[in-house]
């Protein structure tokens, strides 16, 4: 059932979200293939508005990259993945499902870095909902064939583990998903941080996503051509990323929360409140984290039954 989009947000929330969207749009439109994949001195990284890429933002803010890094922001998974497919970016922070979808289609990519993020189930404004069990037959916002789709389906089960019915509402862009929750047009949706905290600050109820379904599910996906042809830029990125991890661990958040505000569009009053994961230095994704997602994808017919993701997770080889 189609629902008409109505804005139910406060003026401040509209400004904070739309400001981030304008940054996303301007960043995307200012980059082209000729200035990214064909320039061996630059590395372009596609990102979504989530805390998965906070170490990259901090490294950028603190000047830890010795080679130029272009952070290219996207508002939806579809836009992000299209940019990697067309060579408009050298790499992107993506969920493991997106990585396997592209790899299964023959795109020459590697997943050498695991990222850390955060997600919460957020309930719509004015809804008498407080638990997963309350979501039976409710309208749930998601984007199809993404990690959110997977986590939603796996989360919405009864006490015996049997899936219960709900109405899927396709909403690709995360800020719009939050907007529809705030206006009461959606009953619930899984949102990444910082959007879950932004919603909570406006009175929306949130709970943890059950069974750690959204833990260990994102990484940095590189074009193989970029790894081969931009070795120095990739080395600079890895070194800068690791420096940022150490810096964040050794310094109070007040010293680097500006990255949350400037590059993630988080309102200043929330930058110190957002729950953050424990970020780790560059490390490979775990096969055990990919496997349940891959099985779900096979059951949905998203990848061939014979696809194993072999060769996708590979370390960056130092030159």
Which residue stretches match the model-derived regions?
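Pocket-lining segment of extracytoplasmic ligand-binding domains
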Residues: 97, 127, 165-169, 173-260
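Predominant activation on well-ordered alpha-helical scaffold segments within soluble catalytic domains
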Residues: 57, 100, 153, 197, ...
């Amino acid at each position: 059932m189609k629902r008409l989009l109505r804005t139910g947000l406060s003026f401040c929330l509209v400004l904070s979200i739309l400001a981030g969207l304008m940054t996303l749009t301007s960043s995307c439109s200012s980059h082209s293939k000729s200035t990214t994949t064909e320039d061996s001195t630059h590395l372009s990284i596609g990102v979504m508005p989530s805390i998965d890429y906070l170490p990259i933002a901090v490294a950028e803010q603190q000047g830890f990259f010795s080679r130029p890094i272009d952070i290219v922001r996207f508002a939806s998974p579809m836009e992000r993945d299209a940019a990697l497919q067309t060579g408009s970016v050298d790499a992107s922070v993506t969920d493991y499902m997106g990585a396997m979808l592209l790899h299964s289609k023959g795109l020459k990519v590697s997943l050498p870095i695991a990222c850390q993020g955060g997600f919460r189930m957020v309930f719509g404004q004015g809804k008498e909902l407080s638990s997963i069990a309350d979501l039976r037959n409710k309208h749930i916002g998601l984007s199809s064939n993404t990690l959110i789709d997977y986590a939603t389906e796996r989360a919405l089960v009864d006490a015996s583990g049997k899936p219960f019915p709900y109405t899927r509402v396709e909403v690709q862009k995360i800020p719009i998903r939050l907007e529809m929750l705030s206006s009461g047009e959606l009953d619930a949706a899984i949102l990444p941080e910082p959007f879950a905290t932004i919603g909570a600050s406006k009175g929306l109820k949130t709970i943890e996503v059950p069974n750690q379904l959204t833990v260990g599910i994102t990484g940095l996906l590189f074009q193989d051509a970029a790894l081969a042809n931009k070795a120095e830029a990739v080395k600079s990125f890895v070194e800068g990323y690791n420096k940022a991890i150490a810096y964040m661990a050794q310094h109070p958040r007040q010293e680097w929360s500006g990255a949350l505000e400037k590059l993630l569009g988080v309102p200043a009053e929330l930058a110190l409140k957002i729950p953050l994961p424990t970020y780790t230095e560059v490390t490979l994704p775990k096969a055990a984290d990919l496997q349940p997602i891959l099985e779900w994808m096979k059951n949905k017919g998203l990848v061939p039954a014979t696809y194993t993701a072999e060769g996708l997770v590979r370390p960056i080889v130092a030159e």
